[in-house]
Amino acid sequence: MKKIISVVLAISLLCTVGAAFAEGPGGRGGNGGPGGGQGGMRGGNSGGTDKSSDTELQSMIAEVAPKFQLLTYEDAETGTSLQYQLFIPENYDETQSYPMIQFIPDSSAVGRGTDYVLTQGWGGLIWATEEEQAKHPAFVVVPVFTETVVDDNFNHSSQIDVAMRLLQSLTETYSIDTDRIYTTGQSMGGMTSFHLSIAYPGFFAAYLFVGSQWDASLLNGLEDESFFYIVSAGDPKASAGQAELLALFDADGAVYSHKEWSAQDDADTQNAAVAAMLAEDCQENFVTFTLGTTLAAGQTSGGGAGEHMTSFDYAYKLEAVRDWLFEQSK
């Protein structure tokens, strides 16, 4: 059970109440690597998203990315290796216990080099900034997958299991609080995190799913987990996936909070909206960015992908969500 326990009657009043590949609990069988679709980033290397004007991101790339170490995990079970980027908290003290967050990038990072998993956006770097570490000293790990590890048909790669053994090995090497391990990811990374919630129930204290979806019929277990699930209404597949999970929660009578707002609202307004959600005392939280609001002025959507690639960083900019994540414990 979660250490953060809410009163059931209060929840019911405050929350929205809703009436090699293998066949496995997190996806469907298949042979070979996952193909295109959202897991494959719909064929786009960067979705046409130019982030050079995001001065905060460019500063993070310059100041934070060099603080990560590129390491290699040797997996005894498969005889394979997996590179990963690791941030160790400054002044790490082995007598203290630290949370750990895993960020899984979208598949545009596959084949783009070991630095791109960090430089592609906010999702990997934000947790290691001085401001975030001052509040939440934490380990940050970003796997460097060499293949697209999930696809829109819910096929999944054995590299995911290697990455999980990597996380376990880190808990044995460093003083990591195993009650405060989190996973997040965008597109392929969010889909992988959905798969992990099924294949490794109870391992993570909380989840942050961004711009992604999974087979909702397999996600009943999320009714007992803590998460934020953030998509753009202009992302056809991710928004449909969110709607399907909401329908599942409704059918099961699960409680949750769901809000929609403009991604162009200022930071204070958006963080206040998150605070209003959290005041409902739900552990299952859904955010939808209003259609068109993840596009910058003059920007056009990515064809059939809509606002898929443009929505990710807006989710990771939500400070109140980041703070909430680190409050969660098993």
Briefly describe each language-model feature range.
Residues 1-4, 8:
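Positively charged n-region of N-terminal signal peptides that target proteins for export
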Residues 8-16:
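Bacterial N-terminal signal peptides
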Residues 28, 34, 44, 230, ...:
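C-terminal catalytic histidine-bearing segment of alpha/beta-hydrolase fold enzymes
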Residues 172-173, 179-223:
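Primarily recognizes the serine-hydrolase "nucleophile elbow" in alpha/beta-hydrolase
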